[in-house]
Amino acid sequence: MTTIKATKGEFVNMINGLFAVQELKGKKFSLTVSKNIVILQKALKELEEAGRPSDKFMKLAKEVNELANLNNEDSKAKIDTLEKENEELVKTRQEQMEIVKKMMEEEIEVELNSLEEKVLPEEITAQQINNLIKIIK
């Protein structure tokens, strides 16, 4: 086990790196990756919940995306109108994202399972290793 002190944002990058390599083969490697994903999901649960958009905002975002995908001349105007009609909802989401941004800068300590170099799959890339470097021994 390795205790790592880092920002929540750095741990988000690490969990994304773990998700990116979970298809690689190797029993010990896969087991360690899976265990670390579970540990990081627990450590970042508060961050995930803080960033979850409301159902109302998700509905608005869907409408905006549908309009944007139409590529009509009046799509932009319709999007602007929707955003103005839902100004408070958009403002609340922006404030929510500011809170999440601050949370991403908070430092925490997490104890993760180490990955030994000898269990790294042959097909792992340097880019994938860079996301996991803090837990490789």
Language-model segment annotations:
Residues 2-137:
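A composition-driven surface/loop motif
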